[in-house]
Amino acid sequence: MLTVALALVLACPQRIHVTAPSARATTATLTVTECGRRVLGPWRARVGYRGVSAHHREGDGTTPAGTFAIGPVVYGLDADPGVRLRYHRLRCGDWWDEDPRSRSYNRFRHVACGATPSFRGGSEALWRATVAYRELAVVEYNTAPAVPGRGSGIFLHADTGHATNGCVSLPRNDLVVLLRRLRPGASLTIGA
């Protein structure tokens, strides 16, 4: 059975497409295709408050353009909503390290609850973002190895009512439908 599932993934790629009408737009359209057929969307998405850029840098307010893998773990504050990927329920002390000087830049980190992490910068206390990060998937932008300053913490997450700092956001109901459908090997293409 596993061999059949693997063959399906290889023969029938799952692709997420985020298309902004222009490089400066803060909204986009998200669709999901499998075997070249649209299976989800079109949905309204939000991108960075400065649009989409192939030259994204840490803190510049753009969403990076290009094609990226989706991380193997979905994170969230609530119980697993039924995703196919591995799920990690966020708890106090779960951070995304966004400090370009840190050795663990652009990675998930857990520190003791209440402890001050050794990394600083714009690092995110994931468990505190109760609207945006009820569920999130990591966009594998600038990972393995991460280049300091090139950008970090690019996620698919719930819409908060405005443009993002560089992530892609969707209305929460659409996000949960997408996260449940995601399978290993999915790719995300962002462009204008």
Where are these regions (language model features)?
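Sec-dependent N-terminal signal peptides
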Residues: L2-L8
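Cell wall/extracellular polymer interaction/catalysis modules
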Residues: L8-T164, L175-S187, G191-A192
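Conserved "landmark" site that anchors the functional core of diverse proteins
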Residues: P171
